[in-house]
Structure formats: structure tokens, C-alpha cells
UniProtKB/Swiss-Prot annotation:
It holds the Pfam family GrpB. Belongs to the UPF0157 (GrpB) family. This is UPF0157 protein DR_2534. Residues 1-37 are annotated as: Disordered. InterPro entries: GrpB/CoaE, NT_sf. Residues 1-12 have a biased composition (Gly residues). It comes from Deinococcus radiodurans (strain ATCC 13939 / DSM 20539 / JCM 16871 / CCUG 27074 / LMG 4051 / NBRC 15346 / NCIMB 9279 / VKM B-1422 / R1). It comes from the Bacteria.
């Protein structure tokens, strides 16, 4: 699948790698989690935000996921939330800008850059102001202001990454934690 190609599927391949020198990569069996690198992740987000704004000038764009928290280990992939009125049209504009569609659900299409094998960013296109938009931001913001919960999330991710190299299973196993955090965040 080349850059700009349409690839829809449930799984997302992750690399199997040995530890990177300097202690940055934490050993896992299937997914590499690296130590926090908030400056580099913020710079990568800014580069992609610029690229996204060229394709979608009116889109709302937010840095989400573990790399946005900045204090916990994460896969070296920046997650970006893009809010638009027409998710399909927005995704197609991003394909024209070089992003590759990886999957879709109702009101949510996700794309990667530069390709699924060398992913440095995943862009989640959702309805601006919709449920998915609010949940992603609520989760990020709660973990940013709750260091103990962020550390618990980090520990869960490390355990799961060591147990599986299947992206779908890794994500599904985090679902209960995410649901609990969303409930707590909504109550606070």
C-alpha cells in the first residue's frame, strides 16, 4: 500500500525491536514503548498540525494520546485528533496530503503518516465537538492533571505491550481502564 492509498483494516502492525542504545526503548515482546520525550513529540505534532491545516484550514486539531501527556512512556507515534463536520471528506483531503487511511468506524477514520510500516503519526478524524472528540480530550486532560492515574496507565501499557504484539488486543485490553478514567473524569 503506497502513500495516499486506501487501506482499511482492524489491525495495525507494530515493530519488533531490540532495545535502542541510550535506554530510550523499553523492552517489549511486540511493541516498543520509549521513555517520555515531550519536546520531540510536541515538535512532531506541530509539523503535522501545519500539514493538516494546509489540507483542512478550518479543522480543529489537538495532540492526544500518551505522547500528549508527556510524562509517561509511549509508542513513538504521535496521535492527532482532527475535528471536522464531514469526516469522510476530511479524510480524503488528508489522503491527498499524503496520509494513508488505516481504518474506519462510524464518525471516525484514522490515517497514518508516512505509511503503516514506518508510522510516526496517527490522525483520528472525528466529528468536531462530537462524543469521540470530547472523550479523547477528557481522557488526555484527566491524565495530565492526575499523575498517579497517568503512572497506572503507563504500567498497564508496559504490561500489555510485553504480553502481545497484536494492536487490536493491546487496545481492547486498555478499554476497561479507559472507561474507568472517562467515568472518573466526567464526575470530577
Amino acid at each position: 500500500m503506497g502513500r495516499g492509498g486506501r487501506g482499511v483494516g482492524g489491525g495495525r502492525p507494530e515493530g519488533h525491536g531490540a532495545s535502542v542504545e541510550g535506554g530510550r526503548t523499553r523492552q517489549t515482546e511486540g511493541m516498543d514503548l520509549i521513555s517520555p520525550d515531550p519536546g520531540r513529540w510536541a515538535a512532531r505534532f506541530d509539523r503535522h498540525r501545519w500539514r493538516i491545516r494546509l489540507a483542512l484550514p478550518q479543522a480543529r486539531t489537538e495532540h492526544i494520546g500518551s505522547t500528549a501527556i508527556g510524562t509517561i512512556c509511549a509508542k513513538d507515534v504521535v496521535d492527532i485528533l482532527v475535528g471536522e463536520v464531514d469526516v469522510t471528506a476530511a479524510a480524503q483531503a488528508l489522503v491527498s496530503a499524503g496520509y494513508v487511511i488505516e481504518g474506519e468506524r462510524p464518525n471516525h477514520i484514522w490515517l497514518c503518516w508516512p505509511d503503516p510500516q514506518q508510522r510516526e503519526a496517527v490522525v483520528h478524524v472525528v466529528i468536531a465537538g462530537g462524543d469521540i472528540w470530547h472523550q479523547r480530550l477528557l481522557f488526555r486532560d484527566f491524565l495530565k492533571r492526575s499523575p498517579a492515574e497517568a503512572r497506572a496507565y503507563e504500567a498497564l501499557k508496559q504490561r500489555l505491550a510485553a504480553q502481545t504484539d497484536d494492536w487490536g488486543e493491546y487496545t481492547a485490553q486498555k478499554a476497561a481502564f479507559v472507561a474507568r478514567i472517562l467515568q472518573r473524569a466526567a464526575e470530577s
